Every structure is written in C-alpha cells, then in structure tokens.
Amino acid sequence: MKIYGLIGVCVLVWGCTKQGSRNTEGENNPQEITEDTLAYEAEKHLKNIRQLTFGGDNAEAYFSFDGSKLVFQAKNPAWNAPCDQIYVTRTNQSWKDSIPPLVSTGNGRTTCSYFMPGDSTIIYASTHEGNINCPPDPPRGAKYVWPIYSDFEIYTADLEGNIIQKLTDREGYDAEATVSPSGDKIVFTSTRSGDLELYTMNIDGSDIRQVTNELGYDGGAFFSPDGTKLIFRSSRPKTEEEIKEYKDLLAQNLVQPTNMELYVCNVDGSDLNKITDLGSANWAPFSHPSGQKIIFCSNHHSLKGGRPQFNLFMINLDGTGLEQITFDRVFDSFPMFSPDGTHLVFSSNRNNGGTRETNLFIADWVE
C-alpha cells in the first residue's frame, strides 16, 4: 500500500523534526498529553489516547501476536530515513527524543510490515535489492497517482534487521503482505497476472494461489479474526473511460487511489461481496474483534469543493450501521485492534502543531 498517497490528497505530510539522539531504549510510558488535546469530544469509543511518535510521517502500525509490540513504517529525516523504513516499538514506549530500533535494511523504500508467528520475526516489502536509494516519486500532474514500484519484493527479517528469507522473487510488484491470525497464511498484492490482484501463500512462501481476478487495484487485505475471510479495498473501474485510464496508468506502474470501496470474500476468493458504496476513497479496513464489523478510513463525508477529510468509520459486513469513530479535521487512518480487542492503534495528524506530521496513537477501545 502506498502509505502516504491518500494523506497527500488532503495535505502534504512530508514533515521535518529536530535531530534526535540514537537512543533505542525509548521512553517507557508514552508522554501524557491532556485528553482534550488528543481526543475529540465525539470520540466515544476511544479512551486514554497516548501518542507514540512525535515527528515525521508514521503509519501502518500493527500489533504483535501477543499484543506487546508494534511494527510500523516511518519517513523521518531526523531518523536518517528519507523514505519509508520499518521500525519496532513496545506499546508502552514513545519516541519524542529518541529513535526506535530499525528492523529493515535502511536501503531502498519499504512498506507494509507485519509480525510473523512467535513475534521474533517480521514480514515486509522492500525495493532495496533493485536499488539501495529511495525510488523516485511520480511526477505531480493534474491527477493524483500512487507509484507501483516493480522492485518491491516481500522478505522476512529478525528484529535486529537481518533478512531471513525472500518470499517473492519475480518481475513486478509484490507487497502489502499481512499474516493470518493462526500464523499459517500470508495474503499479499501482486502484478504477476498483469493486474493488481490478491494472492495467498503459506508462511514459508510456498503454495501461492490467486484470490481475486477482476480488473482493478485489489490491495490492503487483512484476514478476519477467524482466518476464513479477507477484507480489502479495490478501485474496480467499470466504464470504458475508467478502464482505459486504469490500464494506461498501470502500464506506467501507476494507480489513481481516489475512488475505492471495501470488499469481503472467503480466503479462496469465493463469496465475494461489496461492503461499502460510499464513493470517494474507502480504505485501510481491519476487522472488529467480533468479526461482524470492520473499521476503516474514508473521506466520503468531506465537503464538496473543500479539503478532503479522512476519518475512521465502523460498518457491519453487510454494509449497514455506518458509524463515524474519529473526528480529526485532516487525517485519521490505518486502524488496527490489538489481538485481545482492548486497544486501537492508528495514525493521525492530530496534535501536530499545525505541521504536516503524521504520528502514531494508541487508545483503549470502548464498545
């Protein structure tokens, strides 16, 4: 997933921070900032919000299987990360004046990290074997696009940053990998069919199977709590004009992410159903612990002609019961529930002093 693409639709988030010391011990007990600063009055499902990062662009923080750690990606010049790299933190640490442990190579660009079973290794995608430098951003034009870097491959690594295994090794884009709750399967997005489709594989990279086969950018997939279903977002162009534009952009390794809806299917791709029909960009879905609802990011409620506003929403799998969860005026996204369902981690532009920084926050979840 192109992490900061949709943030860029509403505001450029390339932030800058003061240089921090290389202290990977962190600060136990995240710095307390008043609840009034971190929470909006209408955020009734969130309690005791705590800020974990304090500068740069931090996103896609995902819990370890035991719920004690988070792995996330960040772009932060103060951390010597000019483009996204992968870091790990304990949930009771914060990183205001120090730098978290780097667990990617520090080369190329990375995306979409996730813990593997046992919590001593992670999975993530990286371009470092294709080029150790940050890949170029796409040119800014009349339309907003995400790059689909063909150098992205999927790797496993230990928490010291050592590559253990390369799980994919073929021409084209392989990224956006997440792991099933039982730890036996991986779902990811690939262009190996000529389109951006979902695939599954065993935890060791074997038995790769195609899941989706309709034209469009299928990505950002997660398993349901019982591991039987996949939830994901897709662009799914329909009209002749939309199809042509999608294919033309994909031929340039680009996609336009401004119109996406959410879908659910069985792990083998059967029983595919569309969950949302809200228009605009609906993405970053994650299952509620009950397995009957999903939390996701959307800008469908933005005022026409105004700046897009991205917030978290909850919806039933059948598309009913839409409820707004967060209310930042610019950006809330990348939600994930802890394995026991008691906490929610997410990224937000709140409490950034009017800068373009996106930080990580963790909160107690209140039903």
Where are these regions (language model features)?
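Sequence/structural signature of beta-propeller modules
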Residues: 22-40
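Residue-level detector of Asp-centered blade-edge/turn motifs that repeat once per structural unit
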Residues: 65-66, 117-118, 181-182, 225-226, ...
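Hydrophobic beta-strand positions that form the internal "hydrophobic ladder"
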Residues: 70-71, 122, 186-187, 230, ...
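A flexible loop/linker signature enriched in serine peptidases of the S9 family
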Residues: 54-57, 74-86, 104-110, 125-153, ...
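Multi-bladed beta-propeller domains
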Residues: 34-57, 89-109, 157-173, 203-217, ...
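Sec-dependent signal peptide recognition
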Residues: 2-8
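C-terminal motif of bacterial Sec signal peptides marking the signal peptidase cleavage site
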Residues: 14-15
